[in-house]
Amino acid sequence: MRIFDTHCHLGLLYEDPVSQVRAIDEAKRGLALDKDKTKHATVIALANISTNLYDFASCYKNTKNIPNVFHTIGLSPSEVMNPGKDWEEKLDEWLNYENVIGVGEIGLDYHHKYGNKNDQIEFFIKQLDIAEKHELPVVLHNREAGEDMLDILKSKTPSKGGILHCFSENSDYAYKMIDLGIYISFAGNLTFHNATNLHTVARNIPLENILIETDSPFLTPNAYRGKRNRPVFIVETLKFLAKLRNMPVEKLANILFANSLKAYHLSLSDLVYYDNTAESDEE
């Protein structure tokens, strides 16, 4: 059973390049789905998401030759006041690198008060334009800025679509995003007992518009709370979503894997397949 972690931060999980590679290898070995270990799920592919120029440059250098590790590059709202020298030129250049499949994460974050709203909006729109120039999907960050984000995307709808990562809004908002060609991605917080709003959304929106992610090292699934989130833990989110949808894990995994390829405009020919069924080393 194969899984695509559509959003993780290897550079935030580990600065050490050896540890980054180990996290990838662990994910590709996977986790058992049941106590008897008769069923197994492996993270066959992942998207490493950057939040700033340094994050991309260092992590891309460390992992660019590893099969099935893809990258996006973008500057998150946290970088609005200090994006780096010549950031637009560098972004424009680096988006041509091999296995770079999207622009992100980009968006709006009014919770942390990065700059002011107008600064964030201008920063976001500039990167939407760059994504359009390169004909790439966008990976979206939204925190307490849902209406502004929706208004911007209505006027500047990405032609290659996008992913609203770590979804946190209601069902009505999800459908509005889906209408704009945006996939809805659920992270480990879907498994939290009190996340009833997310449970409702995940249970009811069309399966063909759903993705899963870890957002590693953040939002560790409930089964591993207290540990830093790692790509391998995405198995728990898959299992939880299967229960919400009342469907076999295997069937759901196949649908989500296909959705992930579509969201990032990848095909099976872009992947190298593995048959690793050894147990992962759980901490």
Features from the language model and the residues they span:
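Mid-domain alpha/beta scaffold segments of enzyme catalytic cores
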Residues: M1-E283
